Amino acid sequence: MNYKSKGLLIKSDLSRLLKCYKIYAAIIGVSIAILFSTEQIGLINGNILDTYIQGSELSGIMIAYVFCAFPFATVFCEDLDNKYIRYELIRSNLKRYVVTKIAFIYLTAILVMVLGTILFLLSGRIAGGDWVNESVGCMNVLLNGSYSILLKKEHYFLYCVMYSLQLGLLSGLLSVLAGYFSLYIHNRVTVLALPIIIYQILIECSGNTIYTVFIFRAYNRPMHKDWESFSLILLISIIPTILLGCLIYKKIQKRL
């Protein structure tokens, strides 16, 4: 396959994504999910940082993970059902098709989480909320975690973006997992819900140790340096994603 065909495949997926309402609805959905996760009207402790951290900790954040998977996670079953995959394979090959789709599922989920967070933060600022209230809240806990240098320099917006990026790495993995389930389950609601159920089971079974899904929270810092911690978290997200890609490839190969 030449580079022109590869570019056409990526351009086709990008156009398909941007022209679809799902990604825009998902971004808004993530913002709303964070807000309603706090289960109260207004900002926690009167500030945006506490509201965002608490909102991303409570059970409502799981709805945000569903929104992250919503735009693209069911692409494999959709392409197989409407035979669009055969058109794709004329211009490409199966391996390239699977790699491209998984990349879009994974990166779209991260993008939705980050942009949804940014929308939430901007909404809080427009509503007149302060970034922090140093007399109360979770600042002391956050200062012991990753990216504390951003908090010390009062770069609160950038801190929340980095926090959401780490959550995005988890949402990317969960979205690819949903894509894998979509090859076995035709009910799209169930497909989007299953990774969240697995996520909840992991939380219930693993306890409070950081070396589970909690490692994606930026208030935990598994390594001494921020870049080391981020690299570890990136590997924890990408390696299972690659393994799922291999399973997806084999499953589609059998169905063609």
Task: Say what each PLM segment does.
Residues A26-A33, R188-L202:
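Central hydrophobic cores of alpha-helical transmembrane segments
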Residues Y21-I23, L94-K95, V99, N187-L192:
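Membrane-helix interface segments
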Residues V75-T108:
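Helix-loop-helix units of permease transmembrane domains in multi-pass membrane transporters
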Residues Y180, Y184, S237-L256:
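Junction motif at the cytosolic side of a transmembrane helix
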Residues M1-A26:
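Aromatic- and glycine-rich beta-strand/loop motifs that create alpha-glucan
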Residues G128-L142, I196-Y211:
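Juxtamembrane non-transmembrane "cap" segments at the membrane-aqueous interface
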Residues A33-V75, A103-L183, A218-S237:
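Secretory targeting signals
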